[in-house]
Amino acid sequence: MHIGIYINNENISSVDCKNLLAGNPGIGGTEYCVLLLAQVYKMYYSNNKVTLFVAKQGILPEVDNYVVVNGIDDLPAKAQKEDVDVLVVSAVYNGIPL
């Protein structure tokens, strides 16, 4: 199974999010939970592929792949190109509910 997880990390790309098990590094609750999901899912289901779709390259948790997308409108095409089976998207984008 290939899981894709999207996060708009534009405002937190400079924050070290490599080890979220140590706690929230001050990135906000939703962002923390989304990135923690990617990290923990990969830890427990190491045979599954995890791709993080992000707005900016950053200091991110260890997963199989990172794909930079140009906004949420770019996400479906990139996810399809990466052959993602399940795509997780936060219900909030730039502070606005989807």
Predicted regions located by residue number:
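Extended catalytic core of nucleotide-activated donor transferases of GT-like folds
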Residues: 40, 53-98
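N-terminal subdomain of nucleotide-sugar transferases
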Residues: 1-54, 82
